[in-house]
């Protein structure tokens, strides 16, 4: 009886890939974050409380978020990745509560400290 073929090898992990990403929620608000492993299922550490305020229980039953890679590097240091993330937060104004869910750096017009 012929031997069954070996299963395909899993896709290689981009374990060394640093990325800065943008999450877009159904209401159009965004969150900018970084991931130093480029995990396929990591969607950031935005405040659950802040996001939940913007959605009704019915809206929370089914929704879609989008994750876009804005920048990537195999060689950037942690501080370089953090600097790029900071620059994208300011560029996209995702720290403005009307625009996004980033809490840092504090938005100048928000009164937050």
Predicted regions and their residues:
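Structure-specific nucleic-acid interaction/processing domains
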Residues: 2-113
């Amino acid at each position: 009886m012929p031997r069954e073929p070996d299963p395909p090898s899993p896709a290689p992990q981009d374990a060394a890939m640093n990325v800065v990403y943008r999450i877009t929620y159904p209401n159009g608000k965004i969150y900018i974050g970084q991931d130093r492993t480029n995990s396929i299922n990591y969607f950031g550490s935005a405040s659950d409380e802040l996001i939940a305020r913007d959605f009704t229980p019915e809206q929370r039953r089914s929704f879609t978020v989008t994750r876009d890679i804005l920048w990537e590097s195999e060689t950037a240091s942690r501080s370089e990745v953090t600097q790029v993330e900071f620059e994208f937060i300011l560029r996209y104004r995702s720290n403005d509560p009307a625009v996004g869910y980033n809490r840092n750096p504090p938005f100048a017009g928000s009164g937050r400290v």
